[in-house]
Amino acid sequence: MAPVSNQAGGHVAVLAFPFSTHAAPLLNIVCRLAAAAPSTLFSFFNTKQSNSSILASDTSVLRYTNVCVCEVADGVPEGYVFVGKPQEDIELFMKAAPDNFRKCLEASVAESGREVSCLVTDAFFWFGAHMADDMGGVPWVPFWTAGPASLSAHVHTDLIRNTTSGDCHDEKETITVIAGMSKVRPQDLPEGIIFGNLESLFSRMLHQMGLMLPLATAVFINSFEELDPVITNDLKSKFKRFLNVGPLDLLEPTASAATTTPQTAEAVAGDGCLSWLDKQKAASVVYVSFGSVTRPSPEELMALAEALEASRVPFLWSLRDNLKNPQLDEFLSKGKLNGMVVPWAPQPQVLAHGSVGAFVTHCGWNSVLESVAGGVPLICRPFFGDQKLNARMVEDVWKIGLRLEGGVFTKNGMLKSLDMLLSQDKGTKMKNKIHTLKQLAQQAVEPKGSSTRNFESLLEMATTN
């Protein structure tokens, strides 16, 4: 356990969901809270594997003497052999999570000598309501890692199930019974709401979450109120408090967070990306990235590469090593492409760079919000989870991007999308709209902005009990 100030203070226990990209943004917020409340202890509970992954690319958390990064068991029984079931690792973790977290909390309290004064959890952990009650009724403050539209869909799951046909092939039916969702079709919703295996452990967990979140002291989210005012106001009416505290990447960094950190291999690679972008024309570069989890097929990756070659537009492609294949490697090694391929890129800085004019993305929420913060319109190829819903909001509600023709990468479809976004009037309108949203995002994190005020409320809630 990291050293902690001897000054008396509260103890905020933070329970992270260790899969996908849930844990890192939660730890980001924890560090900001810790910097503002140095006498409060923040115990961050996450699996060893997830903690290692986060710390491998960002060691800044180690500077905070009042943040303790702790390990919780992954729920996999000793000697267990995985059989390849969908979400097998998630189900094992979730089944054991309540007991495992309780044991870790008891050990943390015993070691630190501080009782838990506030419980912050990933929103998936609906059982946080019961844990908070068992600890004497401390505040339970869950964090929703995706966007407000997907949160609204989960909170209104029963209403959606009772009022829609559930026909995922009906292109005309939309979700008209929920504020701000009139452009959303049933097939845009995440699995587990009206299609998919509704009886899986994961689907039942999400349904229970939607029922329990209104009991929370507050729910907070990495977004800003001005992006989705209608949905935000509806969620405010459903929760005791609903706090938009983003975009996180635009929040004023603390003095501690702004200090120089040792250069990791990824940081060096990032410097190379930014130096290359410095040499390109304004708004000319297409940035391509599918996050850390999504896996497009080899056929789609080849179609994308062929389209980039044919378009001759400069591009920066963050291509993970586990997505490469011999055919793609051979194609990329020919040297005919007008761009740069790297295994990792510092995405917020890339999207904030003036040379970037388009973002080809899987539409994960963090990527969408970072694109808004950077003022870069999107070309969307969603795959799973909330990504289809995010893409629908991008194209039909905010009108700051477009989805691929046919929904998958083809050479011709990608060329059409690039031409439309970079060269046609429709693309100019998208750029203007996302520039307006960028300005609203910047205003939200100003000293008197909505996200700054909400962050201050979150800080007070977490540290004054």
From Swiss-Prot:
Pfam families assigned: UDPGT
A single GO BP: anthocyanin-containing compound biosynthetic process
Tissues in which the UniProt entry reports expression: Highest expression detected in fruit, with very low levels detected in petal and leaf.
Keywords on record: Glycosyltransferase, Transferase
Gene Ontology MF terms: anthocyanidin 3-O-glucosyltransferase activity; quercetin 3-O-glucosyltransferase activity; quercetin 7-O-glucosyltransferase activity
Residues reported to bind UDP-alpha-D-glucose: T145, A345, Q347, H362, W365, N366, S367, E370, D386, Q387
The EC number(s) this enzyme carries: 2.4.1.115
Annotated metabolic or biological route of this protein: Pigment biosynthesis; anthocyanin biosynthesis
Annotated binding of an anthocyanidin, by residue: H22, Q87, H154, G385
Positions of the catalytic residues: H22, D122
CDD domains per the UniProt record, alphabetical: GT1_Gtf-like
Reaction(s) catalysed by this chain's protein: an anthocyanidin + UDP-alpha-D-glucose + H(+) = an anthocyanidin 3-O-beta-D-glucoside + UDP; pelargonidin + UDP-alpha-D-glucose = pelargonidin 3-O-beta-D-glucoside + UDP; cyanidin + UDP-alpha-D-glucose = cyanidin 3-O-beta-D-glucoside + UDP + H(+)
InterPro entries referenced in this protein's UniProt entry, alphabetically: UDP_glucos_trans, UDP_glycos_trans_CS
Enzyme class: transferase
PANTHER family per the UniProt record, alphabetical: GLUCOSYL/GLUCURONOSYL TRANSFERASES (PTHR11926), UDP-GLYCOSYLTRANSFERASE 74E1-RELATED (PTHR11926:SF1560)
Family membership noted in the UniProt record: Belongs to the UDP-glycosyltransferase family.
Function in brief: In the presence of other necessary color factors, this glycosylation reaction allows the accumulation of anthocyanin pigments. Anthocyanidins are the preferred substrates, while flavonols are only a minor substrate in vitro.
Protein known as: Anthocyanidin 3-O-glucosyltransferase 2
